[in-house]
Amino acid sequence: MRAALAAAAALPVPDAEGDHGPARPHPLAPGALVLIGLSGGADSLALAAAAAFEAPRAGFRSGAIVVDHGLQPGSAEVAAGAACQARALGLGPVLVERVRVEAAGGPEGAARAARHTAFDSAARATAAARILLAHTLDDQAETVLLGLARGSGPSSLQGMLPDTGRLLRPFLGLRRATTRAFCADSGLEPWDDPHNDDPAYTRVRVRSAVLPVLEQELGPGVAEALARTAEQLREDDQALDSLALEGAQELVSQADDGSVALEVRGLAAGPPALRQRIIRLVVSAEFGVSLSRSHTLAVAALIADWHGQGPLSLPGVRVVRQNGLLTFHPHT
């Protein structure tokens, strides 16, 4: 159960041999391969050039994965051109993968899902240790604003992670103008994706209209401030997740019938934010269910607003308070 809770919290399992802190991720082994997610645009082309220069000096190899989404005429030629640029820079291996973008989930989300599936496939095929993506500080600021508009809590304002363990984003501290200037100074010819100027896409409207207005009305530095906010929220979120994991491991017990229980007294002693995280963590780890905020608050009411309520039936799980325990049963 300990490992399942840690996995659900997206945290490393504590190191039983050390100082009880999280185990440190292993560095890249000598000769390890990293793949650049290359579109041919200025950001990814600059990253490809940087990797081609730095990788041999750091003792690892660099290749590229070019994903052809097939969403516009000439996409195969664009992908082939990006692959040629990667090879000219000295990257290898260079893979080109054509993907099918499903209609479900919106065009941006569907394209991203297809792209990441291709990344996974390329990593398996080449035994690559990491995939490097060229998202910039501008991309991060846009992501934070989009999360703010969704209003789905602090997690939606954390932006993109610099390091997920599989994906690395080394350019999150750089502005987009820097990568374009680098390409110009280096004689590299990036491809400009027409979709990046299409206002049909929400992110394009944020980029071309919302951020410029904020900079104009509030002064320069808005993008940097949004990126700093995301970083601070990630730090806070990791701390709260660690506390939630520790609390869950202290309060949880498991029965032979598949149910899981939490001690009510221990949950009630903590602040609401931590209590709700523990509830979400346990339900996610044990039942694979992601509780919405309204469902989480309904469960928390069995602790903080207890007046003899009956069982609570939620998607995938049934919750009962009895004998000082909050017990979660899987729906059968």
Swiss-Prot record:
One of its GO terms (molecular function) is ATP binding. It comes from the Bacteria. Signal peptide: none annotated. GO terms for cellular component: cytoplasm. The keyword Transcription regulation does not apply. Its EC number is 6.3.4.19. Its main location: cytoplasm. It catalyses: cytidine(34) in tRNA(Ile2) + L-lysine + ATP = lysidine(34) in tRNA(Ile2) + AMP + diphosphate + H(+). InterPro entries: Rossmann-like_a/b/a_fold, TilS/TtcA_N, tRNA_Ile_lys_synt, tRNA_Ile_lys_synt_N, tRNA_Ile_lys_synt_subst-bd. Belongs to the tRNA(Ile)-lysidine synthase family. Ligates lysine onto the cytidine present at position 34 of the AUA codon-specific tRNA(Ile) that contains the anticodon CAU, in an ATP-dependent manner. Cytidine is converted to lysidine, thus changing the amino acid specificity of the tRNA from methionine to isoleucine. This is tRNA(Ile)-lysidine synthase. It comes from Leifsonia xyli subsp. xyli (strain CTCB07). The lineage of its organism: Bacteria, Bacillati, Actinomycetota, Actinomycetes, Micrococcales.
